[in-house]
């Protein structure tokens, strides 16, 4: 079977997507041939587009022509710009019943004493402030596995996935309002995270983010051990006390056993980074198909990255289960508009140089592709950054577009697994929630196979459908939740990627 050199995503589209680099003279539609080289994953016009006329992809506006565009021309930053247009939020218009499966899927999870289910079993070392970061790392390093030498200090504790220090750059020199509340919400979410069997929090002692205040505000009494370096007596004594805590915790943590649990215990963070022109064609829709399966099995998926939903939010408000939920999302978009304007920026500055090299032109185009990760089910809730996820189904969390910051908020909210799509090639990893990475195209997958878990480029090559790839992703999610290591786990990624959102002035 001959595969077309281009991909049409919607009957109304005025552009097609190149499956591979197309030389001039390539036939792409009836009576239309390329007049210049079209890079892989980029757009080619199939009809004349006048100045100011909308450019349509996915059946939606992705920008407006800044100069006349002829059929066969490359459509990108040289001839598309942003512009205002009316959006019909049509709250709740597309809400529909979500049919659940009669026989729920299962995985082998770790049932905690409080009934929650973990996918991993870590011991965590958190810090209240950057000033205690090095001490936390010194403690964790004693128990650190080396993926290159094979050294494993935890060999006698096979049911413990690791000891991880999650450090950050703030905790002091900050205002005691929303910035402090946001940090405490994040740390509280990690302290309660189901994938931690035991947690210790290390502070310096004089910081704004006092451990006592953190524990009181987040109701953490009895959940963790706390130490201040100044009170314990300095670096060496604190490190020794931290090591003693971990050694004591290891024996208890190793007692866990996996058991068969329903897929409804999954809370999956949906992420993308290093996106390209194929993201909205292959990996994101396939992850969306897997997301629908998770929701239909009673589980939860979390979409985030508010700036990368900008311009496509009207498609989500149609799926909101209530006007109140939909209006929460619209309010977030207005906040981000005002926030970026105060900083002298604009939302369309979001696409990175790598995004543009991969074929993405505007934030509207990027958002429409990114939104595909969330599938087709109803939007049941909209949350602030790092707020606990308490509802089953598809939820949205307000986060920046920067992947580590976004994922940190999702995991703080309770995600026990992350699915991360990438077109350019991200090496993101996460702890304590494992991260599955999905490649949008086969060329990148082969180039970075040691870092990629799933090749979704098979969709572009006609080897499988979006739904078939989505089923493959769902099956891998169940295996990963059951303990099968991801590619990022093989390199021990995940500690350095803890990145709480920092708001406000540093003083």
Regions found by a protein language model. Give the residues of each.
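Metallocofactor- and cofactor-centric catalytic cores in central/energy metabolism, strongly enriched
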Residues: 1-417, 426-428, 432-507
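Short secondary-structure boundary segments
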Residues: 422
């Amino acid at each position: 079977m001959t595969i077309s050199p281009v991909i049409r995503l919607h009957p109304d589209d005025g552009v097609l997507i190149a499956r591979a680099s197309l030389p001039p003279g390539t036939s792409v539609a009836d009576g239309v041939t390329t007049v210049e080289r079209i890079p892989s994953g980029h757009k080619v016009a199939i009809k004349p587009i006048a100045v100011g006329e909308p450019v349509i992809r996915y059946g939606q506006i992705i920008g407006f022509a800044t100069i006349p565009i002829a059929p066969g021309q490359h459509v990108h930053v040289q001839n598309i710009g942003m512009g205002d247009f009316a959006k019909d939020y049509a709250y709740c218009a597309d809400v529909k019943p979500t049919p659940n499966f009669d026989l729920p899927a299962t995985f082998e999870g770790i049932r905690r004493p409080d009934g929650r289910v973990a996918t991993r079993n870590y011991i965590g070392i958190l810090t209240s402030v950057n000033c205690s970061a090095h001490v936390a790392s010194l403690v964790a390093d004693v128990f650190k596995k080396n993926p290159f030498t094979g050294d494993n200090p935890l060999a006698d504790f096979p049911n413990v996935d690791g000891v991880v220090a999650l450090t950050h750059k703030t905790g002091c020199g900050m205002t005691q309002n929303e910035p402090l509340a946001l940090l405490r919400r994040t740390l509280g979410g990690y302290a309660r995270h189901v994938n931690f069997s035991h947690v210790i929090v290390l502070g310096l002692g004089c910081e704004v983010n006092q451990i006592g205040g953190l524990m009181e505000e987040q109701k953490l009494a009895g959940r963790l051990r706390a130490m201040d370096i100044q009170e314990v007596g300095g670096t060496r004594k604190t490190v020794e006390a931290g090591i003693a805590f971990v050694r004591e915790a290891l024996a208890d943590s190793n007692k866990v056993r996996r058991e068969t649990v329903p897929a409804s215990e999954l809370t999956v963070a949906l992420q993308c980074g290093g996106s390209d022109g194929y993201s909205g064609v292959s990996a994101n829709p396939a992850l969306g198909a897997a997301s629908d399966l998770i929701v239909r099995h009673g589980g939860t998926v979390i979409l985030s990255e508010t700036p990368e939903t900008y311009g496509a939010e009207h498609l989500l408000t149609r799926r909101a289960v209530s006007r109140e939920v939909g209006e929460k999302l619209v309010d977030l978009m207005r906040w981000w508009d005002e926030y970026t304007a105060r900083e002298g920026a604009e939302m369309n500055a979001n696409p990175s140089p790598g995004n543009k090299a991969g074929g993405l032109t505007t934030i509207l185009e990027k958002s429409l592709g990114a939104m595909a990760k969330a599938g087709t089910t109803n939007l049941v809730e909209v949350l602030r950054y790092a707020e606990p996820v308490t509802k089953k189904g598809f939820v949205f969390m307000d986060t920046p577009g920067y992947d580590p910051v976004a994922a940190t908020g999702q995991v703080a909210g309770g995600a026990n697994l992350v699915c991360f799509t990438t077109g350019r090639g991200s090496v993101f990893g996460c702890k304590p929630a494992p991260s599955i990475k999905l490649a949008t195209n086969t060329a990148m997958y082969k180039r970075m196979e040691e870092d990629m878990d799933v090749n979704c480029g098979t969709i572009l090559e006609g080897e499988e459908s979006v739904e078939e790839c989505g089923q493959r992703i769902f099956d891998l999610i169940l295996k990963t939740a059951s303990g099968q290591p991801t590619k990022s786990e093989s390199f021990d990624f995940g500690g350095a990627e803890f990145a709480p959102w920092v708001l406000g002035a540093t003083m």
